[in-house]
Amino acid sequence: MEIIRGFAPAEKRLSRRDKAGFFLDETQRAELAKRLGVDPEKAVNGIIDDIRKQGDKAVLEYTLKFDRAAISKLEVSPAEIKQAAGEIPAELFEALKLAATQVRAYHHFQKEAVWKAAEIMQGKQLIRPLERVGLYVPGGKAFYPSTVLMTAIPAKEAGVDEIILVTPPGADGKIPAPTLAAAYIAGVDKVFACGGAQAVAALAFGTKSIPKVDKICGPGNIFVTLAKKAVFGVVDIDGLQGPSEVLILADQYANAEYCASDILAQAEHDVLASPIMVTTSAELAKRVNDIVETKAGSCARKDIIRQSLRDNGLIAVVDNMDEAIKLANMYATEHLCLLVKDSEQYLSRINHAGCIFYGEKASVVMGDYVAGPSHALPTSGTARFSSPLNILDFVKYIDIVNVSKEEVTKLGKAAVTIARAEGLECHAEAALKRME
């Protein structure tokens, strides 16, 4: 990993974050298109257009083209979903159930807090769950049952009427049993074997098989993300997720093995993942780097890890915790790990992060699977203005206005004055009628 010293060099290096293609200028976009062999935005727009015109037929054709899966139907039957729950190892099934319990409890607690606030606003505002939500779960060569739980359960707790899940099938045309088992545990209503931009388009516009949804949530590759960006406005989306990232703040008291294990876990995600550590200890920086370099070669995904560390890994050594926290807030990371003495005292100084892990035992991996909050977090600096996926993503607020006879004269007079100042005489007349 690259080790740099000093606040200014670290700030400059961290500001060069890869935006994964959806915030790039024309030159950067051209470079990305050359690397991928296709202009991703043009490809996505073409796919969306095909889905709008041809529906299921186009979805099936793209599933064959991109996933090499020759399937004749998109929907997975309820019987297949239930059957999958009995096919996976008992230990995995119990682990998924425990994770589901944790996620459900966390979001139920949040729901109670939100509904309590709504009671205070009684007569002023209504809360209504979205009717139908589409969840995108990455798949194909790998499978992510944890993402099913982390997206479906908050939607379920919020009261969404119908939860639709899309995920790419393998080359055999099937969705992995752990993914289906997680859908069963989470209470997903329908599952469709399709992925990529074509699945996003199908959710946004609807096909004969796949119903149109009100909102699309869940992470994916650059094509999925650009498709979500393109259909925003037709439907709502949770955000534009880029490559996964962690920033570890560590002082001289930090356990070097813990720091190294979290860095390796982050690098294991994919070659675009960003494992970052900012420390006040040059000695710790060297120890952590030595451990990472030694262990990386023995990991199952060593090639991915090494490329991630080479291209995006960084250890920055700064003078004090003030500088470290300033860098953390500037970077606005997806995962922020506080491996420092008395870590709780620094929580009030963190303004921008998707999720904060403090205390030695709070590994990011716990948040990935079993801590309770959703692991669907803002990335690429969007933690400066957005939040983790939660029940508020699956409800909407409706304001209520009622004006009493006692209020209408005072309020109406002001309304008439403002309406006439804006040159809207009919507005003024409507207010005057209520004042008669």
From Swiss-Prot:
GO molecular function terms noted in the UniProt entry: histidinol dehydrogenase activity; NAD binding; zinc ion binding
Source organism of this protein record: Dehalococcoides mccartyi (strain ATCC BAA-2266 / KCTC 15142 / 195)
One GO CC annotation: cytosol
Family: Belongs to the histidinol dehydrogenase family.
SUPFAM superfamilies per UniProt: ALDH-like
HAMAP family reported in the protein's UniProt record: HisD
Protein's name according to its UniProt entry: Histidinol dehydrogenase
Amino-acid positions noted as binding NAD(+) in the UniProt annotation, renumbered to this chain: Y136, Q198, N221
CDD domains hit by this protein: Histidinol_dh (cd06572)
KW Hydrolase (keyword) present: no
Binding site for Zn(2+): Q266, H269, D368, H427
Main enzyme class: oxidoreductase
Gene name per UniProt: hisD
Domain of life: Bacteria
Claim: Metal-binding is one of the keywords in the record: yes
Cofactor comment: Binds 1 zinc ion per subunit.
Catalytic reaction(s) noted: L-histidinol + 2 NAD(+) + H2O = L-histidine + 2 NADH + 3 H(+)
